[in-house]
């Protein structure tokens, strides 16, 4: 048996390459390459296309007559070729058969056919007619001359006639010449021989384009390819989106698994909503219903707490979170929270135990506040207190990151010293009555001042002591014992009482009207509010100058001027603010706003000079010499202003005292009435204070801190003293790191205690309480507030002595740049201008600028009441006896100041701002 491989026996796996052989074993040539095939196809298609252009369609119509006389038509289609000897035109006519020899007859006597016939000529073999009389082309010409519209030649027996016809292409005939052969020629000759009547119609049709179907194929192929590409791209995009969606869904599921779920408990109100910690239940805070299904929370229901502290039913919010990955309320993305510190929560359930401090701020009232600079936003949270009132919590967990907001914080904010908080809430229990906020009057604006005050013995959350606050920055509270080298702790801080760990940010500067309680000649420095107080408000006014219901008869009164100003001029000052506290009685729901004019301050003749400075700081002060302040820089700024309260007969104020009477513009004092004029500086207490009523608590014995009745600073502020001293070593008021500085006569008196940083806007209340012996003509609610603003970002033009530069001003509205130079005309500096006139001016407290001041000098009285010139010597002696502990030199300087302002200040008695 032969091997299948066909090879040698020793190589069975080897195969032979068989050659292609023909039937007899000859080798076949390899197949032609593809370009060669394409060339052949084009070459073959070329002549075919040329022949297609020469094709002539001959339509023969036969007319057969019937016995009835009707004609029956039969159409036969034939195909021929146009000869180059004639034109390629369409022709039609009756078919006439002609013999070739008949065309050779030149006898003109023969009848000529009418024009419009088609001649059909059958050519014979060349052997039968070796010497023709005319050529084929000549015969065609003879037929056209005799009136033929077209000539058809049958060349089946004489194919050479085609070449003879093509030779006449130089001078072609104007009528078509067509030749037929083969089967078409046989059909034509049969019709001509058998039929008597027939018509021929020759048509020249345009040849079909060979690329017609080819172009359609290209278009279809291109369309299919583009469709496939688009389909592939769509599929890829869809798959990518599905993968991304699956990834996002996985991340959402992971984030959802990490979120906490708690059970709702409506009984425990002490816990704040969204607080961090291992709490299994949520209390009923300000929101007790689900924002998705709008149903109330039921005890025991499982709630989902989103990192943005919003809570919803778990069954309601989970599908939304899985699909949209954002909080339905605030659009907080639950997936993109990686790398962010997130919301910092503070557990406030144990605040009463003193574990963690908290800053409680009231809810904002409606209004527009103009900031003087951009303040970075710090996290706040609105919660409910124990009485069900919403409060704003400023919370920020430090965790050792002291520079958390330092890149975004302005320079003046970073310059504030940290708070030193070393007392807690736990030791002191406020025994005063806390009045809960009445839900019947939500967000009702107060009757007087920019914040409401409580008639009860203590403050509620809406009527708290933080009646008007303005953040200048935030600093971290330091533990007790930590000291900043640049700032020496001076005195007891009267800021927010912390407890335990210092993990919260506290405001370093807050504008607060200090608590005052006037009870017929007695003054309590830290009692709760019982009346209307004027505070620095940043709200825009409601044009109180147009009040027509008050007894001032449409005229406004500026506290620092004895002249009457028309209200139309004052009302235009609403956008700038002013020192005036004119009360509009049109509605009890709007604030009396603070105004400020744009003109320079005018020191009226006869008004007393500015309050005297200690002898070590000024040589001319204290001797009754006229005071001239330095020139003021440009800009619409607020200088030292004296703010006063004003009653009107129609204003909706609280009930006055039984012995009070209505006056047109101010306070009426009966002649000869002895006034107990006191000037109280509201500052820090002698010890830790209550968080709600700020009632001072005594320091523990042995603490090494001594206080006096003068009080201390209420809030911390920037460092006010810089090294801007003359060669004599006398310290002077210089620039500070904060935005605002404090005029020297706003420093509180603290005997035995070192000074602490002071707030930018300190409040001085000048109380006029009627003596106990005479009980008519004095309002217990009337008072005056003196506010001093000082620009401390920029250093003064020169180092002036102490607080002499009263014209240093700050911009209240940043956009107001086209203001006048100088101080406002309706504002007085601290020029000993009493709200009741020049005779009731007060003396500045003696300030001690160096730390080496003796104890006796520090224990000098802070204030001394000026004696009214119209009072009797007995009354004057009685008033001076109350402050007999003052040093003799200070009393003498005050007496000189009173004498210097004697006649000019007399008419101010009996008038109010």
From Swiss-Prot:
Subcellular location: Cell membrane
Activity regulation (record text): Negatively regulated by R-spondin proteins such as RSPO1: interaction with RSPO1 induces the indirect association between ZNRF3 and LGR4, promoting membrane clearance of ZNRF3.
Gene: Znrf3
Biased composition (Polar residues): 634-664, 881-890
Region named Disordered: 1-32, 601-669, 855-913
CDD domains referenced in this protein's UniProt entry, alphabetically: RING-H2_ZNRF3
Record-stated family: Belongs to the ZNRF3 family.
Keyword S-adenosyl-L-methionine: no
PANTHER family per the UniProt record, alphabetical: RING ZINC FINGER
UniProt lineage: Eukaryota, Metazoa, Chordata, Craniata, Vertebrata
Entries under Pfam families matching the protein: zf-RING_2, ZNRF_3_ecto
GO function terms (MF aspect): frizzled binding; ubiquitin-protein transferase activity; zinc ion binding
Keywords from the UniProt entry: Cell membrane, Developmental protein, Membrane, Metal-binding, Signal, Transferase, Transmembrane, Transmembrane helix, Ubl conjugation pathway, Wnt signaling pathway, Zinc, Zinc-finger
Organism: Mus musculus
Signal peptide: 1-52
Catalytic activity: S-ubiquitinyl-[E2 ubiquitin-conjugating enzyme]-L-cysteine + [acceptor protein]-L-lysine = [E2 ubiquitin-conjugating enzyme]-L-cysteine + N(6)-ubiquitinyl-[acceptor protein]-L-lysine
Topology in membrane: Single-pass type I membrane protein
Enzyme Commission no: 2.3.2.27
Bias kind Gly residues: ranges: 903-913
Subunit text: Interacts with LRP6, FZD4, FZD5, FZD6 and FZD8. Interacts with RSPO1; interaction promotes indirect interaction with LGR4 and membrane clearance of ZNRF3. Interacts with LMBR1L.
GO terms classed as biological process: limb development; negative regulation of canonical Wnt signaling pathway; negative regulation of non-canonical Wnt signaling pathway; negative regulation of Wnt signaling pathway; protein ubiquitination; regulation of canonical Wnt signaling pathway; regulation of Wnt signaling pathway, planar cell polarity pathway; stem cell proliferation
Protein name: E3 ubiquitin-protein ligase ZNRF3
Pathway: Protein modification; protein ubiquitination
GO cellular component: plasma membrane
Ranges that cross the membrane: 217-237
Cytoplasmic topological segments: 238-913
Renumbered zinc finger spans (RING-type): 290-331
């Amino acid at each position: 048996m032969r091997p299948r491989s066909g090879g040698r026996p020793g190589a069975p796996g080897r195969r032979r390459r068989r050659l292609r052989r023909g039937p007899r074993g000859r080798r076949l040539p390899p197949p032609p390459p593809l370009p060669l095939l394409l060339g052949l196809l084009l070459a073959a298609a070329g002549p075919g296309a040329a022949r297609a252009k020469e094709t002539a369609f001959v339509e023969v119509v036969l007319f057969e007559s019937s016995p009835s006389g009707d004609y029956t038509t039969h159409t036969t289609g034939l195909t021929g070729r146009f000869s180059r000897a004639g034109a390629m035109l369409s022709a039609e006519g009756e078919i006439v058969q002609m013999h070739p020899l008949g065309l050779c007859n030149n006898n003109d006597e023969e009848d000529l056919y009418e024009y419009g016939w088609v001649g059909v000529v059958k050519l014979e073999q060349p052997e039968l007619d070796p010497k023709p009389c005319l050529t084929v082309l000549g015969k065609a010409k003879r037929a056209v001359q005799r009136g033929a519209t077209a000539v058809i030649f049958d060349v089946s027996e004489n194919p050479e006639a085609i070449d003879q016809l093509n030779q006449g292409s130089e001078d072609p005939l104007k009528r078509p010449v067509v030749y037929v052969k083969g089967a078409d020629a046989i059909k034509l000759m049969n019709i001509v021989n058998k039929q008597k009547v027939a018509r021929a119609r020759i048509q020249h049709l345009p040849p079909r384009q060979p690329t017609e179907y080819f172009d359609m194929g290209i278009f279809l192929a291109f369309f299919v390819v583009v469709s496939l590409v688009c389909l592939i791209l769509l599929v890829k995009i869809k798959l990518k989106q599905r993968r991304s969606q699956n990834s996002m869904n996985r991340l959402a599921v992971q984030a959802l698994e990490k979120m906490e779920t708690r059970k709702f408990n409506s009984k425990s109100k002490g816990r704040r909503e969204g607080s961090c910690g291992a709490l299994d239940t949520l209390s009923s805070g300000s929101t007790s219903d689900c924002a998705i299904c709008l149903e109330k929370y039921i005890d025991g229901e499982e709630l989902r707490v989103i990192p943005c502290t919003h809570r919803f039913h778990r069954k309601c919010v989970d599908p939304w979170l899985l699909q949209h990955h954002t909080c339905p309320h605030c659009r907080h993305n639950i997936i993109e929270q990686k790398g962010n510190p997130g919301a910092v929560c503070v557990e406030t359930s144990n605040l009463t135990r003193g574990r963690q401090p908290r800053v409680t701020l009231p809810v904002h009232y409606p209004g527009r506040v103009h900031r003087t600079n951009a303040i970075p936003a710090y996290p706040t949270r609105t919660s409910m207190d124990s009485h069900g009132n919403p409060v704003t919590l400023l919370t920020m967990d430090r965790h050792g990151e002291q520079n958390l907001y330092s890149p975004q914080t302005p320079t003046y904010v970073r310059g504030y010293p940290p708070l030193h908080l070393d007392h807690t809430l736990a030791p002191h229990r406020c025994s005063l009555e806390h009045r809960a906020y009445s839900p019947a009057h939500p967000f009702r604006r107060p009757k007087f001042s920019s914040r409401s005050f409580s008639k009860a013995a203590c403050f509620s959350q809406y009527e708290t002591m933080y009646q008007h606050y303005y953040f200048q920055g935030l600093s971290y509270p330091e533990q007790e014992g930590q000291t900043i080298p640049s700032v020496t702790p001076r005195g007891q801080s009267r800021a927010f009482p912390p407890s335990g760990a210092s993990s919260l940010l506290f405001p370093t500067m807050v504008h607060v009207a200090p608590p005052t309680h006037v009870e017929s000649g007695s003054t309590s420095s830290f009692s709760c509010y019982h009346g209307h107080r004027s505070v620095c408000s940043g709200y825009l006014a409601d044009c109180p100058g147009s009040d027509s219901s008050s007894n001032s008869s449409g005229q406004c009164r500026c506290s620092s001027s004895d002249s009457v100003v028309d209200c139309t001029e004052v009302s235009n000052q609403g956008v700038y603010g002013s020192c005036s506290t004119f009360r509009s009685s049109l509605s009890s729901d709007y604030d009396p706003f603070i105004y400020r004019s744009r003109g320079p301050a005018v020191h009226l003749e006869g008004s007393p000079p500015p309050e005297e400075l200690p002898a070590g700081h000024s040589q001319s002060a204290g001797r009754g010499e006229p005071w001239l302040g330095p020139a003021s820089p440009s800009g619409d700024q607020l200088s030292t202003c004296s703010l006063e309260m004003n009653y009107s007969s129609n204003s909706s104020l609280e009930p006055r005292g039984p012995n009070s009477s209505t006056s047109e513009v101010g306070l009426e004092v009966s002649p000869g009435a002895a006034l107990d004029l006191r000037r109280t500086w509201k500052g820090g207490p002698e010890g830790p204070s209550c968080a709600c009523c700020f009632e001072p608590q005594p320091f523990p014995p042995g603490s090494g801190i001594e206080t006096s009745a003068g009080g201390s600073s209420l809030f911390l502020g920037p460092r006010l003293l810089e090294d801007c001293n003359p060669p004599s070593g006398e310290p002077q008021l210089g620039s500070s790191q904060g935005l605002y500085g404090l005029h020297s006569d706003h420093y509180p008196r603290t005997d035995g205690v070192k000074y602490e940083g002071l707030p930018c806007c300190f409040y001085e209340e000048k109380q006029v309480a009627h003596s106990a012996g005479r009980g008519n003509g004095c309002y217990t609610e009337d008072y005056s507030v003196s506010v001093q603003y000082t620009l401390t970002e920029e250093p003064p033009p020169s180092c002036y002595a102490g607080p002499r530069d009263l014209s240093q001003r700050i911009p209240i509205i940043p956009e107001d740049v086209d203001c006048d130079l100088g101080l406002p005309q309706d504002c007085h500096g601290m020029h000993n201008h009493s709200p009741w006139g020049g005779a009731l001016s007060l003396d500045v407290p003696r300030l001690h600028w160096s730390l080496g001041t003796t104890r006796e000098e520090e224990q000098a009285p802070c204030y001394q009441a000026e004696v009214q010139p119209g009072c009797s010597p007995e009354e004057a002696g009685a008033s001076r006896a109350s402050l007999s502990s003052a040093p003799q030199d200070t009393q003498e300087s005050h007496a000189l100041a009173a004498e210097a302002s004697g006649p000019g200040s007399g008419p101010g008695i009996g008038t109010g701002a």
